Structure formats: structure tokens, C-alpha cells
Amino acid sequence: PELTGDVSTDAWAKLLWHEQFTTPARPDAQPTPGTSFAMAHDGDSLFFAVKCKALAGEAPEELARENVQIQLDSERRGLRSGIFVCYTDGKASSAIELEADGKEAWLGEVGYGSRLQAGGWSMVLKVPLSQLAHVEEGLQRIQFNVSRVLRAHGAPNSLLSYPAPKNIHFWRPSNATGEAEFE
């Protein structure tokens, strides 16, 4: 897949898109429509694509201030995870979050592209599989979390996650609870 941020191409249309984004720390919360993601790999890199539609009442300038945070725990132990913060302006940052509080630098380069347009934005993140530490022979499974940060942090309903963690500290490695298996 290309890193243009355009997720309407054939490569993305064939994938399974997940849409059950809900508010963290609210087990009774209903999914909020308008956010979905897909994941793929090509043997060399892992790709995440996210589509974010403007929510009811969301102004264009609010949409432009959003970001998506993707957390990957390739060791599946909840001790450390890569976190990738992806912005609408095409910029991204990456780090390693530690469960024992603290951060380390992400040692590698990632690819990123975004596309902001009226009514929504989309993004594609590319992480080389060689940069993901793992505990077994070959990288076969990862745990992950995808979060959409909507408005100023701390505002009501400012965060949607898939899967929704049990607490609001979504960047904690122990909250990477979704699991993907490579075929």
C-alpha cells in the first residue's frame, strides 16, 4: 500500500475494516460511528490505515487538530510498547512506552501519510517488521490499540479506542489488548 493517506484504493478496499470504537473506561459505552481501521502486512512491513469521519457538530478546525495514536506490543507481555502519534498534517512521532512509567526512543524509521479533506481525514502508518521486538521464533502475533483523540484532551468524549481499555490511560502498554495474528 502507498503512504499517501488515501485509503480508498483497491489495496485498502479488500481489507476487513474494524469500526467498534468506544470511550475508554466505560464498559457500557456504545460504539461511536465514524472511525475505522484496517491492518495488513506485506512480509516486510506492518501497515495500519485509519479513517476518521467528522462527528456531528465537529468543526473543520477541530477535525484538523485530531490525532490517532497506535500502540503496538509485539512481545505481548504488557511491559513496553511502541506508540505512534499520527497527525492530520502528515507528521508523526514515535516512542517506546514502558509500563513502569517512562519512555525510550523508537530506534528506527516509520513511514506515514495522511489526507485531510472536508468531512474527514485518513492516514496510513508503515512500521518495518524488523523493528518490532518479539519473544518467539518469527513475529506471528502482536497486541495493539488504536485510539482517536478528538478534541482538547480531557474534554468529554475526547477519546475513542479499539479495543476500549478498562482505564483512560490508553498509552499504557498493558492496554494493548487487541490481538492480530499474521498469516
Task: Please place each PLM-identified region on the residue numbering.
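Structural preference for beta-rich elements and adjacent junctions enriched in aromatics
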Residues: 1-183
